[in-house]
Amino acid sequence: MDPGDGTAPLDESFTETVDFCGRTYQKYALTNGVFFAPIDEDEIARLELMHSVLSRVFDDRLIFPPVGSPRRILDCGCGAGDWAVDAAGRFPDCEVLGIDASPHMVPEDPPSNLEVQIDDLNGRFTFPSDHFDVVHSQMMAGGIHANRWRSYVRDIFRVLNPGGWCQMVEIYFNAQSDNGTLQRGELSYDLLKPP
């Protein structure tokens, strides 16, 4: 990846941490309302588990449509990098770029075709237009400010190649069943319904 193809550079404040209730947090993320999850080993384990669960739910499909041989993939909010590492492994001839606000959870030994940049996705993308074949954004609802969502989605579509694929994955905590077996009034439904 060309170092100029990225987002705005950040200062050293991204490395500062704060401890609270026995957990470590990124000070920048808390101060700027980027995300409120810890950045410690327990959080990395939680992210790995979430990746495993989503992989199983999605029948081990990283990208939903058949995309052939993508040349460039962008993973927005890559966290501990599990999805990006898998994408780099499945598409070894592809450049995979992961972006995350925290430098504390970057994969220790990433594949050679994976680069991770530290940046706040609440700022505008500086990538060139029509640059990526796939843009993946997963579990970003808590990390993108409400007033940024429209421009965030516009940025994603601007940097996608014509015919490229935008894949956004969020969890909607509303218990449902496609065959009607889960009904209102059942304990499992009531426990899982949103407040």
Pin down the residues of each PLM region.
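N-terminal charged/capping segments associated with class I S-adenosyl-L-methionine
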Residues: 1-130, 134, 148, 170-182, ...
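A short beta-strand submotif of the Rossmann-like class I SAM-dependent methyltransferase core
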Residues: 137-140
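A short His-aromatic
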Residues: 142-146
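A short glycine-rich, Lys/Arg-flanked "PGG" loop and its adjoining helix->strand segment in the class I
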Residues: 150-165
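Extended, non-catalytic structural segments that build the interaction scaffolds
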Residues: 191-195
